[in-house]
């Protein structure tokens, strides 16, 4: 998967903002990206501190652009633009103060076209990455929410990687029917970029009416709405997980559609199920988990786990740039 993404990026290199420019993991990943010559890092922070940090750990970041919010020539223009975007919710002084923070500053670099995408969160919380994106990048026309998905990858016996999509595992706590449909639509669209031919299962503790309750109704209704919205995408449910992935179980439960037993894209009923589900696949199923990848924004802004390593930063940078 990554070889194909890199090949595509080499034909049209992108620029990515890293909001934590002195972090050793960011610097190591930036050095690797620069050596590949397909993605240009923009490191936010003090140039002397970034250079010293890179030298201390022995990574060559020559070729990266370093931008310091404290000494940025375009700050007045950026403040004016942010005031306009916030529509009276922040004064110029409040915007200027916010732009001293690398998460807001980096997001505005993307908004103003100085970079194609952003990756943050190595030291920031998810909220501190998502909040500026919601306020400044905003959601796509027609979208009401930001959501997230994970790419799950593991080697298969055939020699090719097995790739699954799981959503929403990180952002929306208890999405309603229409929000689940939006999550499904955005996940399907993005999954195709990464080589997944989506077969979507809306997951539940019930399979086609075997269980009862409001949560079952929610998933069943959302599934029907998604089918109507995307008639060319195989979508099924509500399914229990085993019925979604096991042909034998699907046969036993008399599921006859194209999704039952063969699903590769999973829509969870809430964040509890989604977060637990992807981590079980990661820890017990030997899948590598990449994400959360944010959905529904006007530009690619993604969040790292604070426990990430340099390899995960490198991989997420490629994934983020592929969406630009």
Where on the chain are the PLM-derived regions?
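Anion-binding alpha/beta catalytic cores of soluble intermediary-metabolism enzymes, centered on
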Residues: 1-260, 265-324
């Amino acid at each position: 998967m990554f070889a194909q993404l890199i090949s595509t990026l080499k034909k049209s290199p992108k620029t990515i903002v890293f909001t934590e420019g002195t972090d050793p993991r960011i610097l190591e990943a930036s050095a690797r990206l620069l050596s590949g010559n397909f993605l240009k890092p923009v490191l936010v922070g003090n140039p002397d501190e970034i250079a010293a940090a890179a030298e201390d750990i022995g990574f060559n970041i020559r070729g990266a652009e370093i931008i310091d919010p404290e000494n940025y020539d375009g700050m007045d223009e950026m403040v004016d633009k942010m005031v306009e975007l916030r529509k009276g919710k922040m004064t110029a002084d409040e915007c200027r103060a916010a732009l001293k923070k690398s998460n807001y500053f980096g997001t505005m670099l993307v908004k103003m076209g100085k970079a194609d995408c952003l990756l943050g969160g190595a030291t920031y919380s998810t909220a501190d990455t998502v909040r500026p994106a919601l306020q400044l990048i905003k959601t796509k026309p027609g979208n009401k929410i930001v959501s997230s998905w994970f790419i799950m990858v593991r080697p298969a016996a055939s020699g090719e990687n097995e790739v699954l999509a799981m959503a929403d595992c990180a952002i929306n706590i208890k999405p309603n029917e229409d929000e689940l449909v939006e999550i499904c639509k955005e996940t399907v669209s993005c999954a195709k970029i990464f080589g997944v031919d989506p077969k979507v299962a809306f997951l539940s503790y019930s399979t086609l009416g075997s269980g009862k309750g409001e949560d079952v109704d929610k998933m069943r209704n959302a599934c029907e709405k998604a089918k109507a919205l995307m008639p060319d995408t195989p979508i099924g449910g509500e399914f229990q997980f085993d019925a979604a992935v096991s042909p034998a179980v699907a046969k036993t439960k008399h599921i006859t559609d194209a999704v039952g037993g063969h699903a590769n894209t999973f829509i969870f009923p809430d964040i509890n199920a989604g977060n637990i589900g992807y981590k079980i696949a990661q820890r017990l199923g030997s899948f590598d988990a990449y994400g959360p990848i944010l959905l529904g924004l006007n530009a690619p802004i993604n969040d790292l786990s604070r426990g990430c390593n340099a390899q995960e930063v490198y991989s997420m940078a490629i994934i983020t740039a592929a969406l630009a």
